[in-house]
Amino acid sequence: MEDKTPIISFRNADIVNGEATVIYGLDMDVFPGDFVYIVGKVGTGKTSIIRTIISENPLYKGSGTVCGYDLKVIKEKEIPYLRRKMGVVFQDFQLLMDRTVEDNLLFVLQATGWKNEEQMHKRITTVLKAVGMELKAHKMPHQLSGGEQQRIAIARSLLNEPQVIIADEPTGNLDTETADGIMKLLTGINKDKGTAIVMVTHNRQIFEKYPGRVMICKDETCYEQKADEVIDLDITI
């Protein structure tokens, strides 16, 4: 039977950035297998939603649950456990530049409680194969292209078999062809594994070419709209 319990759910939630409220009354559900885009102009609260989802920004008003955790009452010590249930991919990759690809991934596994060396190396091999980077395990990040570094970042996000991948402008620093490859990878993970994906983007071509649900951030609100009806946004490639 299909699971209809949302992985992410907000009801009448006010999203803050520091002391300022940037979005009022957010209603949003993300279910297993969903691909949800968050789009809008710069400064409309897109990244603040992401930061709230990963419990980097607090939730004071309204309700919000992510991977079974209530964001209004989550304890500081519980936040690492919440984040283990999700994968996070950033625009700037955030790889550790002083260690190899394999050691980057090993660091994450050790930090999230893995102990068995054989199991860790097996998991690293599995995720690198999933993103087509199995031959790059012993490379340093600076030896990789931007697209390859982003593939490694996606592999890192898959290590703990997340319920959802949170991607903040994952194609923002990439050329069109490389960005297309990253989108094929993400949509493949979404379809093949049923992993939900929430992705911030400013690139209209992406959500037109790779269909998903579209949430628009505008005028201190965020609401769902059909992709082919998104005509009033000043967002560019």
PLM regions with names:
Residues 71-87:
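ABC ATPase NBD coupling module
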Residues 62-70:
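Conserved ABC transporter NBD signature motif
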Residues 98-107:
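Short coil-to-helix segment of the ABC ATPase nucleotide-binding domain corresponding to the Q-loop/switch region
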Residues 165-168:
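Catalytic Walker B motif of ABC-type/P-loop ATPase nucleotide-binding domains
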Residues 54:
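Helix-to-loop junction immediately C-terminal to a conserved catalytic motif
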Residues 159-163:
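A short, proline-enriched helix->beta-strand linker immediately N-terminal to the Walker B motif
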Residues 140-150:
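Conserved ABC ATPase signature
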